[in-house]
Amino acid sequence: MIGLSYLLVQVVSFAGILVIDHRWKLAAFRAPAAAALAVTASVALLLTWDVLGVRSGVFFRGQTDFMTGLLVAPEIPFEEVVFLAFLSHLALVCAAGVSRAVDHARDSRAARASRPSRMTGERR
C-alpha cells in the first residue's frame, strides 16, 4: 500500500483542482476538447523534455518506497505522467481563473463608473 502513496496524493490533488474547475467552469468543464488538447500537448512536450534529460544523464529516477515502480519509459515513472497532466491542468485553471478575476474587476469598475454619484447625481 505504501507504494501507492505518492500516486494517491497526486490523484487527490488532481481531484481537488477538478472540483474547482467544475465549480467555476474554468477549463475542462468550460471547453473540454480545448482543455484536453492543451493538456495532451503540454504533457507530450514535457515528456519529450524528460526523455531528453534522461538521455543526456541529467534526469534519473530516484528510488523510494512511496512510488508504484511502474515505468512508462526508462527512468520515467508512471507518477511523472500523472504529475505532468496535473501540472498542465492546474496551469489552465490558474490562467482561466486569473483572466476571469481581471474581467470581473474591470466590469465592476465600469459599472460603478456609470452609476450616478449619490451626492450630486452626476456620473463619476
UniProtKB/Swiss-Prot annotation:
Gene Ontology molecular function terms on file: intramolecular lyase activity; lycopene beta cyclase activity
EC number: 5.5.1.-
Topology of this chain in the membrane: Multi-pass membrane protein
GO biological process entries: carotenoid biosynthetic process
Keyword Transmembrane belongs to the record: yes
GO cellular component, one term: plasma membrane
UniProt function note: Involved in the biosynthesis of C(50) beta-cyclic carotenoids. May have C(50) carotenoid beta-cyclase activity and produce the C(50) beta-cyclic carotenoid C.p.450 from the C(50) carotenoid dihydrobisanhydrobacterioruberin (DH-BABR).
Protein name listed in UniProt: Putative C(50) carotenoid beta-cyclase subunit A
Native source organism of the sequence: Dietzia sp. (strain CQ4)
Lineage per the UniProt record: Bacteria, Bacillati, Actinomycetota, Actinomycetes, Mycobacteriales
